[in-house]
Amino acid sequence: MPTQKINKLLIGTNNSGKLREIKSLLPKNIEIHSTSEFNLKSPIENGKTFKENSLIKSKYFSKKTGLICLADDSGLEIDLLDKNPGIYSARWGGRHGDFNKAIKRVYSELSKKDKNWKRKKIRARFVCALSISYLDKKISCVQSKIEGSIS
């Protein structure tokens, strides 16, 4: 696909914090739009991977608006929890994505697996997939991760 300059870009999220973070990383000459401008609800994320869920969002929002859309899916994988919460990370925070609630659940689940987990370094990683789509066509999709531990 030939490279073309992007003048307008839709950020495929209803999370205002995420929108602000992504916007701060992009060139100032790109006209940024949010899903809230179009009163769009998020699609059902029924993919099995971060990449699949990212693509579901970018294609959905692009088709709804006719704009090129950048969307992400990200989460925490914890080895002791069989890579959970994984693609369900946001759901661990409850209906409103409460970070403190999600962390409490992580600690609770770790304690169920190993009561002494706090004395150990539990391998974990943050995974993020980003995709750009135009209508129903994927332009690009990448994924990366940052390895670390919970202690």
Model-inferred region functions:
Residues 2-10, 16-151:
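Anionic-ligand binding patches
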